[in-house]
C-alpha cells in the first residue's frame, strides 16, 4: 500500500535547491557569523556557475508543490490522512513558509554586498 503523494517531496526539493542556489553567497556569511574562518570558505564560490540551475529547480519544485497542494483532489475516504481537516491547512502553512525561505535564499546574493 503506497502513501498518497501530497507535495512533501516537491517542498523538500524546492527548499534544498534554494539553499544550494544561495550557498555561494549565504554560506560564507553564515560561517563567518558563526565564528568559522579560513581560506577554504572561498571554495564555496565554486557553486556560483550552478546557481541558475538551482534557482530553476527550486522554482519548478515549488510550482509542483503548489499544484499538488492547491489543486482539487479526489474525495478522501474516512480514516485517510487527507480527511483530517488540519492536514491540508498544515501543508499550506509549510508550503508558504518554504516559499518565503526560498525567496529569501534566492534574493540574498543581491543583498549580501551590503554586509561586506
Curated annotation (Swiss-Prot):
State the GO CC annotations. plasma membrane
* Keyword check for Magnesium: no
Single GO molecular function: mercury ion transmembrane transporter activity
- Positions binding Hg(2+) in this chain are 24-25, 76, 82
Residues annotated as transmembrane: 16-36, 46-66, 94-114
Protein origin, superkingdom = Bacteria
Is Zinc included in the keywords of this UniProt record? no
UniProtKB keywords: Cell inner membrane, Cell membrane, Membrane, Mercuric resistance, Mercury, Metal-binding, Plasmid, Transmembrane, Transmembrane helix, Transport
Q: Which Pfam families match?
A: MerT
Family, according to the entry, reads as follows: Belongs to the MerT family.
Q: Which NCBIfam families match?
A: PRK13751.2 (NF010314)
Tell me, in a sentence or two, what this protein's role is: Involved in mercury resistance. Probably transfers a mercuric ion from the periplasmic Hg(2+)-binding protein MerP to the cytoplasmic mercuric reductase MerA.
Its protein name is Mercuric transport protein MerT
- Name the species this protein comes from: Pseudomonas fluorescens
